[in-house]
Amino acid sequence: PDFDYAAASEADRLQRLAAWVGHIDLIEISDGALDDEAREALAVFRRMAKLQAEVGDEVFGTYVISMTHSASHVMEVLLLARLVGLCGHNGRDWFCRIQVAPLFETVDDLQRSEAILDQLLSNKVYRALVAANGNHQEVMLGYSDSCKDGGILASNWNLYQAQLSIIAL
C-alpha cells in the first residue's frame, strides 16, 4: 500500500516483485481494488490455474510476454501467476507450473535483452522458479517490430547480436 510502483526505479520494482512472488503465503487481492485491465489479467491467470487443476500442467504452453522492455515485465507476470498459485514457495520447496518467455521485439529491446535476462537470472527468486521448472528458460526474439523500428539491416544485425549474447548466458 505504501509503495508507489509507477514511480519506483526498475531495481526497486524488481526487488519488490521478487519479495511478493517469493512470499510463502498467498497474497489476497480484492477484485474491487483493481482497475478493469488488472481484473481482466488476473481473470486470465485464474482461468489458467483452474484449467491446470482440471486437466493437468500440460494444458497450456509457454506464456509469451510481448514487448518485454524490462526484467520487471517478466516478474509482473510471475506475480499474477503467484496470486493464483501457479508459482511460488510453499514453505519447503519452490514450484513453478508456468513457463514464461520474454519476447524482445524492438531494436532497443534486442540490445537490452542480455542485460534484462542477466537481471532476471541473477535474481534469487526468479532463478529458483526457473530451477523449479526444469532449469529451462525460453526466449523469443521478434523480427517484424525491430525491422519497422530500424530497417532490415539493423534488425538482422541486432537479432544476430542478441542471439549470440543470450546463448552466452
Where would I find each of the regions flagged by the language model?
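Glycine- and acidic
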Residues: 25-36, 56-67, 95-106, 142-154
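Extended, charge-enriched "interface" segments that sit outside catalytic cores
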Residues: 1-54
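Secondary-structure-rich domain cores
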Residues: 46, 53-61, 72-98
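Phosphate/oxyanion-binding active-site loops and adjacent basic polyanion-contact surfaces
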Residues: 36-44, 65-76, 112-113, 158-159
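Active-site capping/gating regions of soluble enzymes
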Residues: 76-89, 101, 105-169
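Ligand/cofactor-recognition surfaces for anionic moieties
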Residues: 34, 47-50, 59, 159, ...
